[in-house]
Structure formats: C-alpha cells, structure tokens
Amino acid sequence: MIIAITGTPGVGKTTVARKLAEKLGCKYVNLRDFALEKGIGEVKGDELEVEVDELAYFVEKEFKGKNVVLDGHLSHLMPADLVIVLRAHPKTIAERLKERGYSKDKIGENVEAELVDVILIEALDEHENVIEVDTTGKTPEEVVNEILNLINSGIKRRVGIVDWTKVYEEIIPYLRLGGD
C-alpha cells in the first residue's frame, strides 16, 4: 500500500511520515530526495522544481505493489492508495515557517493555502481515499495514533473536519505580512 502524507509546509509531514512508516514497518520515502536520486527536477534556491507527471511515473515504477509512506507536499499528486492530508492552524504554520527563515511573502502564501484548503482540494481532485487530520495542539505520536486508528477501522475517506474561516480575523496579519 502506498500512503501519501501531504499538507502545507509546516504541518509536520516529515515527522509524522517517518513515525508512521516506522509503526507500519514500511519504507519511508522523501519525495524531494527521491526526485534528486532519479535525476529529475531542478534545484532553485531552497526549492526543487519538478515535473509532477515525471515524478509520478518514477514513483509508480519504483513503488507499485510495495508498502511505502511518501512524504512531501506533492505526495497527494502521486499514485497512492491512501492520502493523508495533515492540517494545522494557519497561525501555527506561520510561526513554524518564520522559525525556518521563510520570507514574509512565502509565509503569507502558505498561510493562505492552508486557510483555503488548497492541498485538500487538490488531493480530492486526484484521489478517492483521502483522510484529513488536524494536527493542531497534538504531538506527532498522537497524530500517528489517530491515523493508525482510522486506517485500522477501515476508514478511507474523512474530510471536512477543518474550517479555518472561524479564525480568519486572527489570521489576517499572517496572510501577507508574515505575522508582523
């Protein structure tokens, strides 16, 4: 089974994906590293620009029929049996990205993406089996246990559990000002 862990930068994808792979006894695959290994994409600054279709081809070729956990904000665009969309309060995302040294514009862009469900909508356009998990205020272990409970109970689709419009006023400073 290919499980894709996706979400806006700053939601905790890598930590959760590594722990989930460990608990399931699956191979952990960082899509950025995988693309670089395969010689696809181009590094521009801190970002890797890659053709999604080309990456998807290599993912399917390499992992079809195997048990892997894919980690990356493009993983929901890859062939997968189950997509887990991690969500986090936009303010939390802004704070984490600020700590990572993201520019104000990049912080605003990612806060906005989380606010309007960009990754979730893209995942639903590509896949039937999509589970949304709110990571806000939870430890990575709690998130992994929630995912495992959902998988073990046979749930393949759970969406619509996050609505950031209720906190929109609180998020406005983070949209284009990076929290300042």
UniProtKB/Swiss-Prot annotation:
The protein's name: Putative adenylate kinase
Subunit annotation: Interacts with uS11. Not a structural component of 40S pre-ribosomes, but transiently interacts with them by binding to uS11.
Gene3D superfamilies reported in the protein's UniProt record: P-loop containing nucleotide triphosphate hydrolases (3.40.50.300)
UniProt EC number: 2.7.4.3
Ranges for region NMP: 30-50
UniProt xrefs under InterPro entries: Adenyl_kinase_AK6, P-loop_NTPase
Transmembrane regions: none
Family per similarity comment: Belongs to the adenylate kinase family. AK6 subfamily.
Keywords: ATP-binding, Kinase, Nucleotide-binding, Ribosome biogenesis, rRNA processing, Transferase
GO molecular function: adenylate kinase activity; ATP binding; ATP hydrolysis activity
Region (LID), start-end ranges: 99-109
Its biological purpose: Broad-specificity nucleoside monophosphate (NMP) kinase that catalyzes the reversible transfer of the terminal phosphate group between nucleoside triphosphates and monophosphates. Also has ATPase activity. Involved in the late maturation steps of the 30S ribosomal particles, specifically 16S rRNA maturation. While NMP activity is not required for ribosome maturation, ATPase activity is. Associates transiently with small ribosomal subunit protein uS11. ATP hydrolysis breaks the interaction with uS11.
